[in-house]
């Protein structure tokens, strides 16, 4: 799953895949702004078939946070 998440991040943010680690923070480490994070969440929802409510999306700060949420809520 990490590889697919990385692929989406590379596509959305234009960062090098080598920069993306599980502990990478979207804003601090990968340079995402608030619009980028919204677009990332929408891409993760579409790719993995999960719904991430705004209240949960606000808690997702790192790559590992996304993976944990998807694994816990995948249908």
UniProtKB/Swiss-Prot annotation:
Sorted alphabetically, which SUPFAM superfamilies does this protein's record hold? ACP-like (SSF47336)
Task: From the UniProt record, give one GO term of the biological process aspect.
Answer: lipid A biosynthetic process
Q: Name one GO molecular function term.
A: acyl carrier activity
Top-level lineage group: Bacteria
Q: Cytoplasm as a keyword? A: yes
Instruction: Kindly provide the PTM information from the record.
Output: 4'-phosphopantetheine is transferred from CoA to a specific serine of apo-ACP by AcpS. This modification is essential for activity because fatty acids are bound in thioester linkage to the sulfhydryl of the prosthetic group.
Record-linked PROSITE patterns? CARRIER (PS50075), PHOSPHOPANTETHEINE (PS00012)
Tell me the Gene3D superfamilies matching this sequence. Answer: ACP-like
Question: Which keywords does UniProt give here?
Answer: Cytoplasm, Fatty acid biosynthesis, Fatty acid metabolism, Lipid biosynthesis, Lipid metabolism, Phosphopantetheine, Phosphoprotein
Any Pfam family: PP-binding
The record's subcellular location field reads: Cytoplasm
Q: Which residues carry this modification: O-(pantetheine 4'-phosphoryl)serine?
A: 34
Q: Do you know which InterPro entries this protein is assigned to?
A: ACP, ACP-like_sf, PKS_PP-bd, PP-bd_ACP, Ppantetheine_attach_site
The answer to keyword Lipid metabolism applying to this record is: yes
Q: Where is the Carrier domain?
A: 1-74
Pathway listed for it is: Lipid metabolism; fatty acid biosynthesis
Cellular component GO terms held in the UniProt record: cytosol; membrane
Give the PANTHER family listed for this entry.
Answer: ACYL CARRIER PROTEIN (PTHR20863), CARRIER DOMAIN-CONTAINING PROTEIN (PTHR20863:SF76)
**Described function:** Carrier of the growing fatty acid chain in fatty acid biosynthesis.
By its UniProt entry, which HAMAP family does this protein fall under?
Acyl_carrier
Which protein family is it in?
Answer: Belongs to the acyl carrier protein (ACP) family.
Q: What is this protein called?
A: Acyl carrier protein
- Give the organism, scientific name: Fusobacterium nucleatum subsp. nucleatum (strain ATCC 25586 / DSM 15643 / BCRC 10681 / CIP 101130 / JCM 8532 / KCTC 2640 / LMG 13131 / VPI 4355)
The gene designation is acpP
